[in-house]
């Protein structure tokens, strides 16, 4: 096995000795005068919200009214039923097999959310969608109207 990189010193032993002499000149083995680097501090990302489908803003840039509206929307989304995808015993049932938002097949055990129109989506996909537009991506039925009417009948 050869080394394709040319070096002025072709002898591995001489490279090893050079490395040891470099360390000795830097005072290895003694306490360095430098402090160790500060620990890595992970910055918490600022959430990005979509007050309307065409706008994207950081949470810190929203007005109080927009923050209230987003909090209400999140509250409504949390009231939508969620579950786990189960295609059935034989898997041949006429069930939806693909999330139309991400175009990925559902896999047994995937977290899903049910909309009042009976369409299902991956939980993360539909939650993100509903933060932008409160309509079903398949049939365009308003989700909030169906949610509010279901509260009135109970």
From Swiss-Prot:
Changing residue 103 to A/G: Loss of UBE2N-binding. No gain of UBE2L3-binding. The keyword Nucleus applies. A motif (PPxY motif) lies at residues 37-40. Residues 1-53 are annotated as: Disordered. Changing residue 12 to A: Loss of GGA1-binding. Residues 41-51 have a biased composition (Low complexity). Changing residue 103 to V: No effect on UBE2N-binding. Gain of UBE2L3-binding. This is RING finger protein 11. It comes from Homo sapiens.
